[in-house]
Amino acid sequence: MKFTEHEMVFFNSITKGNDVFGIPLKFRTQKSHEEEVKKTINGLIEKGVLASETELTKMGFLPARALECYKESRNHVIINYLHIALLEQREAIVIIPLKNREYEMLRLPRVAVLYLLLKIYPVLQTGTVSEKELLQLQDIDSFLREVKDCKENIMIGEFQ
């Protein structure tokens, strides 16, 4: 689901923790602060995330919980603006910054994320596919265990 930066700030404010790893969320006001808050709340009501100014819907719980899981994750990977948090339950939260300070948030199986990354960025695949390499490519669980056991955050991509 797509959210504006102000809507992401709202979700950040109602979940545990402070910062969202790798994403500098800030409530930037163009008009008065009060007008921006009302505009954000009305946008969330239109999307079905809020029932009223103080009541979160079941549909609103899912993105709030996804952001909370992203913040609680110990393992994050950033690949060319894709912000990925690896969760314990073989899932991943992917936050994609879009144009006009909007974000798309997805909850996917980790294997699906890895498959999509290899498909989108063929540079991550190296060499020819021999039988030995094919066996390594098929053993995704081993790769995921290595990433999970990694104590540090991983960043892959070109940075300027």
Residue ranges and their predicted role:
Residues 1-45, 51-52:
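Short, amphipathic alpha-helical interface elements at domain boundaries
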Residues 117-160:
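Long, low-complexity, charge-rich intrinsically disordered regions
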Residues 51-118:
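Accessory beta->alpha helical hairpin/"wing" motif in late/C-terminal subdomains of nucleic-acid enzymes
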Residues 12, 38-41, 64, 68, ...:
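Generic detector of well-ordered alpha-helical segments enriched in charged/polar residues
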Residues 2-6, 11, 57-60, 136-145:
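Ser/Thr-centered flexible coil motifs
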Residues 29, 47, 58-61, 156-159:
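A short-motif feature that recognizes glycine-rich, charge-decorated loops
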Residues 24-33, 39-43, 110-118, 122-126, ...:
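Disordered, low-complexity tails and leader-like regions
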Residues 1, 28-38, 51-56, 76-84, ...:
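Generic structural signal for short, solvent-exposed loop/turn connectors between secondary structure elements
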